[in-house]
Amino acid sequence: MKIIDFRVRPPLKGILKTAMYANAPRRDRFTRQLGMEPAPSAQKKSMPLLLKEMKDAGVSRGVIMARLSDMLGSISHQDVQAICKAYPKIFVGIAGVDPPSRRAAL
């Protein structure tokens, strides 16, 4: 059975500006509140470690979603596309639409 991670945030491009990477203490505190330890790939902002963690966990594909978020940090469609193009056998992208700006997305 193939495992797909539907919420992966690789440490690349603008994703590094999101709260997950830019505010490591917040990320680590939140992760521990959920009873888990922060992923070494997130702590070290390491793409090779992320790929190893995915492989070790049996994850065959990761889904990256674009989003517009002032509080948590935005992930652009261009960044999602570039990451998926660089790792076509690993990542799949999903567009994100900001509901107040939905007409601009058409």
Identify the meaning behind each predicted range.
Residues 1-106:
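Helix-coil boundary/capping segments in enzymes
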